[in-house]
Amino acid sequence: MFQDNPRLAQLKQKIQETLPKKEGTIKASDKGFGFLEVDSKTSYFVPPPYMKKCMHGDKVVAFIRTENEREVAEPSELIEQSLTRFIGRVKLFKGKLNVAPDHPQLKKLSLKAKTKKGLNEADFQEGDWVVAHLVRHPLKGDDGFFVQISHKITDANDKIAPWWVTLAENDLPNSEPAGIDDWQLKDDADLVREDLTALPFVTIDGESTKDMDDALYAQQLPNGDFALTIAIADPTAYITPEDEMDKVARERGFTIYLPGRNIPMLPRDLADELCSLMENQVRPALCCSVTIRKDGVIGDDIRFFAANIKSHARLVYDHVSDWLETGSSEQWQPSEEIAQVVRDLYAFSQARANWCETHAVVFPDRPDYRFELSADNDVVAIHADMRRTANRLVEESMITANICAGKTLQTTFGFGVFNTHAGFKAEKMADVVELMAVNGAPNADAETLATVEGFAALRRWLATQETSYLDNRIRKYQSYSEIGNQPLPHFAMGLDVYATWTSPIRKYGDMINHRLLKAHILGKAPVQTPDETVGEELALHRKHHKIAERNVADWLYARTLADEPAKETRFQAEIFDINRPGMRVRLLENGAMAFIPGALILDNKERIECNGEDGTILIDKEVVYKLGDVLEIVLTEVNQENRSLVGKPTQVFADLVSETQTSTEQPAEGAENNEPQA
């Protein structure tokens, strides 16, 4: 009788006008109630009836009223809904279509759904993975939540789900772009390609690599210096900035690398065949020649030019590494000509590595973790591949080539696509100086650390320390690497300028730099110049690709390690993050990340302290763990729904002996000096 009473509505409005309002974010619990988080220190209880009008993550305005002598929040206005486009799983209730969001805090929701026009509801089964859109929300005046399914990703039990679901979640493609029937060479009429087909270039790649985009040649000169030539595949010979394929490449940004598979940026017929620097096949290439002094210094005779080249040998990392490290390889016996090229490339790479160790920054060796999959997409094994001699040889060649490109673009145009890093965050510099002063770092004043040379010197000093604790500590004070169109320094590498051009099959920014380098060769205005937005676009692509790579890996780790808690398998793990709730570690055997809550280290809040600022964990005020430490752990939980691992140390910390106990009990003979173990 009161439902449509205008007087009652008017009274309710007057009451609400007198109530205070707060803006905040909804945090749901798994028990029906929630909280309105206004800031880090202020939150209000949201009773279950009010939670039915909102969901976890919604930004809302709420009335703050008193009920049962307690302040509670009643959401009244939606500022921003947490769900718009999302990934979910089909739930069928009495034959009716519902969707449960694939989100740890929202999985228990079951939202009524319908399919968009053109999709058949009969094609959807329990547990199927879908892309859905929240189209109705109670705080928008709707009766309830309602979603529309726009796309079916895959069936409930399809083992390809980790890849397809993750790609859909990040709105990324799951296949390469379509090729065209007849690729045509579109060189500028004035571009002359030198004939280098007789020069014995070699490619060094993984055994299964098809998109071979770099070929190398080096010759050690009588005075000990090295004549180096780097040849790079040339997709911009076939794709102009006006072509539709260029727009596709820009929209993708990079080839997407996921565990066990990749999604190429360019069509495979171009990347794996026409542009790939295959053995004994003539290919157009963009080349750089330069002299590297025997002390590793890059000479001033940098020359970029276009050429037709031919790879004389398709080599494999492990075979070359075996041959260089042991003198022979069971799988590969080079001709004397190729052997000499490889020896000279190796000697060049050692000269450059030695220079970097004293003038720039050398990154510590860490394994690349590689998932081996069966034909059915099951994980067969997880390999920890260390960077070997041949990998370093190619890496030094590519870094040298990119330094040469950076210098050339800076001098010729003053712009390009540059990888940059600004060193320490300005607002954190005082913290860095204080931390380094306490630990005896030389020349670690703010003025010095604000230079590339000073930053690099500090990184080299940190690399000489017995542990990686300090190195881990200062990482959070560092800026993020960026991509931009200005020639700024790359502090993290210890370089004044750095512009990549060595992977144009896989990186759109490298395609832009190819066009700029061709303009430099021709002495003409560039056919494409990088605008202000290109760097932001590429950085955003890279961010989404890394998230996708990590999410697929987390899913596969959870699937692969599901039985390990029951087996109580022991793992060596390295601490890479410490915060108030506990610490995060990486399993050295396979690269999986696990969380170790403080309560599983020692279930006594009075005795344990997890200090995120110092990167330490203390028990009874004594440091027991710190960043960079390696410890033995077991997994206690593998949550396949959330794709997360929880573990605990195998080390057990004893209970404190009470004063009463120690005063009434006599110590055993000869044990007077023994103290309880922390």
UniProtKB/Swiss-Prot annotation:
Pfam families: OB_RNB, RNB, S1. Residues 193-521 form the RNB domain. GO terms for molecular function: exoribonuclease II activity; RNA binding. Residues 658-678 are annotated as: Disordered. Coiled coil: none annotated. GO terms for biological process: mRNA catabolic process. It catalyses: Exonucleolytic cleavage in the 3'- to 5'-direction to yield nucleoside 5'-phosphates. It is found in: Cytoplasm. Its main location: cytoplasm. InterPro entries: CSD, NA-bd_OB-fold, RNase_B_OB_dom, RNase_II, RNase_II/R, RNase_II/R_CS, RNase_II/RNase_R, RNR_Ribonuclease. GO terms for cellular component: cytosol. PROSITE patterns: RIBONUCLEASE_II. Its EC number is 3.1.13.1. Keywords: Cytoplasm, Exonuclease, Hydrolase, Nuclease, RNA-binding. Residues 568-650 form the S1 motif domain. NCBIfam families: 3_prime_RNase (TIGR00358), PRK05054.1 (NF003455), RNase_B (TIGR02062). Involved in mRNA degradation. Hydrolyzes single-stranded polyribonucleotides processively in the 3' to 5' direction. Belongs to the RNR ribonuclease family. RNase II subfamily. This is Exoribonuclease 2. It comes from Vibrio cholerae serotype O1 (strain ATCC 39541 / Classical Ogawa 395 / O395).
